[in-house]
Amino acid sequence: MKKLLTRLALLMILCAALALPVFADAVTDSISVCIGYFGWSEDEYVEKTKFSWQELDDWYGGALDTHEEYYSYCNGSGRTYLAFARGFYIRDLLDYAGVDVNSIASIDFFTKDHSVGAYRSFTKYALLDQPRYYFPNLAGDAETGELYAWDGGDDLWVGAYQVEPMLALEDYTEWDTAGFDFESYADESLFSTGSRFHLFFGQASPEEAATSSAAKYVYKILVTFSGTPALSSEESNLDLVVGSDHALHVTADAEDDALTAYV
């Protein structure tokens, strides 16, 4: 009987361990930027560059300016999600990686806690061109599922301002609060690196529900360029006998030198 109880206890501990979410070991120390074209499989994308977080964090001598920003979200059921984060703008990362932002069609984010495919995909317009905002006056009632203005008025846009999409090196997040209240106590002392790299991008409107898209543990970005590589040859008119051998030299012109070499 004692052996049976011991085995049951061990089994319960094992099950509990398997049920734990991914946390500390999912934190990413480096991030890759990979490039390719629409229709390519994930393994066909070319790794343009890979950076450790120290190479990017200006607090540790890194190359990118980091910023402290607030971000607001709602989940579509009356719950709000607030973030205070320090990190670098995605636009700056792509520029530093040598990616032509104007040629991008879409951007995919891969995370360590999501094993199959991209965790979240955006068109270039949705992530980088569409204005996105922080709404400090946004509050919600989880019981009714309704959103309301924290200041008691009827304008959810009070105090709103535009924000840039970011990959956070450290952050503090909280559910079921409003930005005006959150800002009164959220500070650097609450920062944690436990979700690095953490994607934040704000809201296009107060009602936009996108809490699940604030991806944690990002380790790879797939950049898809619009169009296709252009292939050309100096030989335009070939007069050959059927079955004869002839080497045709083709030149590839892609959106990036790394892709030109690959194609």
Positions of predicted regions on the chain:
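Bacterial N-terminal signal peptides
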Residues: 9-19
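Short acidic, gly/pro-rich beta-turn/loop elements at beta-sheet edges
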Residues: 18, 119, 258-260
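N-terminal intrinsically disordered, low-complexity segments enriched in P/E/S/T
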Residues: 24-228
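Extracytoplasmic soluble-region selector
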Residues: 26, 100-103, 227-263
